[in-house]
Amino acid sequence: MAAAVAAAGAGEPLSPEELLPKAEAEKAEEELEEDDDDELDETLSERLWGLTEMFPERVRSAAGATFDLSLFVAQKMYRFSRAALWIGTTSFMILVLPVVFETEKLQMEQQQQLQQRQILLGPNTGLSGGMPGALPPLPGKM
């Protein structure tokens, strides 16, 4: 105890062990441990149910209605997005993909014709000679 008084005079803060006698400090620790054990017996659902009791019935019912409405809206949006995605995907496959395949096929045919012209007539004629609307090759350069 004399050490505690001397430490207090020096301006240092006292620890709980220095303030309480040793027997009382041990009892305080045991009581804290017992309090913790009592709190651990309670489940999470029991704690949440207990927390709801601190709000008035009006607030609880409003929160419940808001949650139900949010759940309903989320379900409706999910169903709508599924239907919209299905309609969009099938429409794209039926309407757009055939056009894409035909344009790709046409480009491949044009590329093959260009390659055949280059093979038969030479490298310079494949680019300028066979294309309609293109300028004729210059007479001095061959």
Curated annotation (Swiss-Prot):
Residues 104-142 are mitochondrial intermembrane. GO terms for cellular component: mitochondrial inner membrane; mitochondrial outer membrane translocase complex; mitochondrion. Residues 1-41 are annotated as: Disordered. GO terms for molecular function: mitochondrion targeting sequence binding. It is a single-pass membrane protein. Its main location: mitochondrion. The chain crosses the membrane at residues 84-103. Keywords: Acetylation, Membrane, Mitochondrion, Mitochondrion outer membrane, Phosphoprotein, Protein transport, Receptor, Translocation, Transmembrane, Transmembrane helix, Transport. It comes from the Eukaryota. It is found in: Mitochondrion outer membrane. Central receptor component of the translocase of the outer membrane of mitochondria (TOM complex) responsible for the recognition and translocation of cytosolically synthesized mitochondrial preproteins. Together with the peripheral receptor TOM20 functions as the transit peptide receptor and facilitates the movement of preproteins into the translocation pore. Required for the translocation across the mitochondrial outer membrane of cytochrome P450 monooxygenases. This is Mitochondrial import receptor subunit TOM22 homolog. It comes from Mus musculus. The lineage of its organism: Eukaryota, Metazoa, Chordata, Craniata, Vertebrata.
